[in-house]
Amino acid sequence: MEAIDSAIDPLRDFAKSSVRLVQRCHKPDRKEFTKVAVRTAIGFVVMGFVGFFVKLVFIPINNIIVGSS
């Protein structure tokens, strides 16, 4: 019986913690959602520009290295 309890107790604690987390969570209002969406979009654009400029810099370097053979 003790082996069963030792296997079930962590599951019970996890379930209690999960229920507590779901009860504390709230759905974002329109203003908060818009703010998160805009910041995420800005992050995507910035990462895209960084990738573009890295590619732009390394294309000539790669051509110099490969072209010298």
From Swiss-Prot:
It comes from the Eukaryota. One of its GO terms (cellular component) is plasma membrane. Keywords: Acetylation, Endoplasmic reticulum, Membrane, Protein transport, Translocation, Transmembrane, Transmembrane helix, Transport. InterPro entries: Prot_translocase_SecE_dom_sf, Translocase_Sec61-g, Translocase_SecE/Sec61-g. It is found in: Endoplasmic reticulum membrane. It is a single-pass membrane protein. Disulfide bonds: none annotated. Residues 1-32 are cytoplasmic. The chain crosses the membrane at residues 33-61. GO terms for molecular function: protein transmembrane transporter activity. It holds the Pfam family SecE. SUPFAM superfamilies: Preprotein translocase SecE subunit. One of its GO terms (biological process) is intracellular protein transport. Residues 62-69 are extracellular. The modification N-acetylmethionine is found at M1. Its main location: endoplasmic reticulum. Belongs to the SecE/SEC61-gamma family. Necessary for protein translocation in the endoplasmic reticulum. Heterotrimeric complex composed of SEC61-alpha, SEC61-beta and SEC61-gamma. This is Protein transport protein Sec61 subunit gamma-3. It comes from Arabidopsis thaliana (Mouse-ear cress). The gene is SEC61G3.
